[in-house]
């Protein structure tokens, strides 16, 4: 096995965010990809009791690994054992009611009214 000597900016960002994940907190992983990887890594390594909600409203899934978050956001492998399958509107509603502690956002487009366009 070779030793990695260089890391991409994406990998550094994921590891940095993973270190910030706190036990017992709820995270909104919006945008898939890097935010979801970071939350899963933080949950696995540092904060096993951290929970997360995906941008499409799936609450506390236990994904079957391996899976590719960008391609399987609502696939059965990604939302295994979820507490609830909601919608993007329900995820936003939970956040507005204060049921989420932090949001981890990916690169996306936000218009002047605060609407998020995270399509790909």
Placement of each model-derived feature along the sequence:
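Conserved alpha/beta enzyme-core scaffold
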Residues: 1-120
